[in-house]
Amino acid sequence: MSIVTKSIVNADAEARYLSPGELDRIKSFVLSGQRRLRIAQILTDNRERIVKQGGQQLFQKRPDVVSPGGNAYGEEMTATCLRDLDYYLRLVTYGIVAGDVTPIEEIGLVGVKEMYNSLGTPISGVAEGVKCMKSVACSLLAGEDSAEAGFYFDYTLGAMQ
């Protein structure tokens, strides 16, 4: 739930107007909107690079994934793995734009561990791929922008633990 929605819900539950502190937090959130949109745009514009390089890093760190018997062995399965990484990058951009983890949670993380377990895919490999993408993505950003994006990658990784 965004800070705007959360503040309104809390104030309404208490039948009161928004407090000066709540209004200041909302103002700060609104003012940071341009920065969040810029970060999401950079990640979106570089999505192919982030996914490709993140995948390459994953396959170097975890050669078992692309070896015979591995979950990303063969051209088709490698493409499926990269498709999944792209999906998690997209979720991260949703969180950045919203300034909140709710879209990540509600759209893509509910049941993620169970899904991969049912497919026989080790969640640790998926998480490692997301970590690798975080490294690539954050290298494209500086300072606060990198920290902002990193937060949403870390949230996604936390749900995979």
From Swiss-Prot:
GO cellular component: chloroplast thylakoid membrane; phycobilisome
Gene3D superfamilies: Phycocyanins (1.10.490.20)
Miscellaneous comment text of the record: The light-harvesting antenna system in red algae and cyanobacteria is formed of phycobilisomes. These are composed of the phycobiliproteins phycoerythrin (CPE), phycocyanin (CPC) and allophycocyanin (APC). Cyanobacteria also contain phycoerythrocyanin (PCC). The phycobiliproteins all share the same subunit composition and organization with variations in the covalently bound open-chain tetrapyrrole chromophores.
Organism: Pyropia yezoensis
Annotated membrane topology: Peripheral membrane protein
Main location: plastid
UniProt record, GO biological process: photosynthesis
Subunit relationships: Heterododecamer of 6 alpha and 6 beta chains. The basic functional unit of phycobiliproteins is a ring-shaped hexamer formed from two back-to-back trimers contacting via the alpha chain subunits. The trimers are composed of alpha/beta subunit heterodimers arranged around a three-fold axis of symmetry. The phycoerythrins also contain a gamma subunit which is located in the center of the hexamer.
Family designation: Belongs to the phycobiliprotein family.
Record protein name field: Allophycocyanin alpha chain
Keyword terms, alphabetized: Antenna complex, Bile pigment, Chloroplast, Chromophore, Electron transport, Membrane, Methylation, Photosynthesis, Phycobilisome, Plastid, Thylakoid, Transport
A Pfam family per the record: Phycobilisome
Posttranslational mods: Contains one covalently linked phycocyanobilin chromophore.
Localization, UniProt: Plastid, Chloroplast thylakoid membrane
Keyword Transport appears in the UniProt entry: yes
Domain of life: Eukaryota
PTM sites of type N4-methylasparagine: 71
Binding site for (2R,3E)-phycocyanobilin: 81, 83-84
Annotated function: Light-harvesting photosynthetic tetrapyrrole chromophore-protein from the phycobiliprotein complex.
KW Thylakoid (keyword) present: yes
